[in-house]
Amino acid sequence: MPLLAVNVDHVATIRQARLAKSPDPVAAAALAELGGARAIIVHLREDRRHIGDRDVHVLRETIKTRLHLEMAATEEMLGIALKRKPDMVCLVPEKRQELTTEGGLGVAGREAELAAYVAKLAEAGIPTSLFIDPDPRQIEASKAVGAAYVELHTGAFADAATPAARQKELDRLLAAIPLAKSQGLGVNLGHGLDYDNIYAFKDTPGVSEYSIGHSIVARAVLTGMVEAVSTMCAIIDGFPD
């Protein structure tokens, strides 16, 4: 069955709203694991707007499952990844003005640059995932640069304004999953997934992991992190491998 990876960035967002010490994303990660999360995700942005270096360090020392580090493909972040040794790195595009990641990484056209970057991580035993749109060109380029996984960007599906638009985006995703698998890539899905729209994938094989953050943290504010995570786990547990 596919696994649930919980992103705790938005716990840090609440903390940073008051420049306080709580709520602590490290504590939230521990509770997410108690609820059944099989991995914890944090995005260490260049501007450190939510997750900070301390969070990555303490999470690496304390979580019992797996740590996935989302980051831009910069030299600074490469140094941090090589030092902290996350279980996976997911390379994402990054703009300082954006509220959240707005689209997939443009891998096509940057193959040589990204291949060298991915190789440095691989030499340290760190597999790389690339956060991409469900586009055949990006999938083929991801394979070419040596990525182990792709995370298909589900944001356009989640944000679609009409049923027809949502179906169009879902069809793109459903076509991209087997294409990526045929290239030997592992497939994760993430961005904008919640307790309702996740059911669109209930009969979809080939997904290794669902990456979910905001909807779980939003529910956790009202019901607690353990309940919020366990409810999502119960949904995903019924999905095919």
Swiss-Prot record:
GO BP terms: namely: pyridoxine biosynthetic process
Catalytic positions are: H43, E70, H191
SUPFAM superfamilies xref list: Pyridoxine 5'-phosphate synthase
Q: Which UniProt keywords apply?
A: Cytoplasm, Pyridoxine biosynthesis, Transferase
Q: Report whether Cytoplasm shows up as a keyword of the record.
A: yes
Q: Which Gene3D superfamilies match?
A: Aldolase class I
- Output the superkingdom of the source species: Bacteria
Q: What class of enzyme is it?
A: transferase
* Pfam family of the protein (one): PdxJ
Major site of localization recorded for this protein = cytoplasm
Residues binding 3-amino-2-oxopropyl phosphate: N7, R18, G192, G213, H214
Show the catalytic activity: 3-amino-2-oxopropyl phosphate + 1-deoxy-D-xylulose 5-phosphate = pyridoxine 5'-phosphate + phosphate + 2 H2O + H(+)
What does the record give as EC number?
2.6.99.2
Q: Which residues form the signal peptide?
A: none
| GO MF annotation list | pyridoxine 5'-phosphate synthase activity
> Which residues bind 1-deoxy-D-xylulose 5-phosphate per the record?
D9, H10, R45, H50, T100
Q: Name one GO cellular component term.
A: cytosol
List the residue(s) that the UniProt entry marks as the site Transition state stabilizer: E151
Q: List the disulfide bonds.
A: none
Q: Where in the cell is it found?
A: Cytoplasm
Task: Cite the annotated pathway.
Answer: Cofactor biosynthesis; pyridoxine 5'-phosphate biosynthesis; pyridoxine 5'-phosphate from D-erythrose 4-phosphate: step 5/5
Record family assignment: Belongs to the PNP synthase family.
What quaternary structure, including any partners, is listed in this protein's UniProt entry?
A: Homooctamer; tetramer of dimers.
Q: What does this protein do?
A: Catalyzes the complicated ring closure reaction between the two acyclic compounds 1-deoxy-D-xylulose-5-phosphate (DXP) and 3-amino-2-oxopropyl phosphate (1-amino-acetone-3-phosphate or AAP) to form pyridoxine 5'-phosphate (PNP) and inorganic phosphate.
Q: What is this protein called?
A: Pyridoxine 5'-phosphate synthase
Q: State the organism named in the record.
A: Solidesulfovibrio magneticus (strain ATCC 700980 / DSM 13731 / RS-1) (Desulfovibrio magneticus)
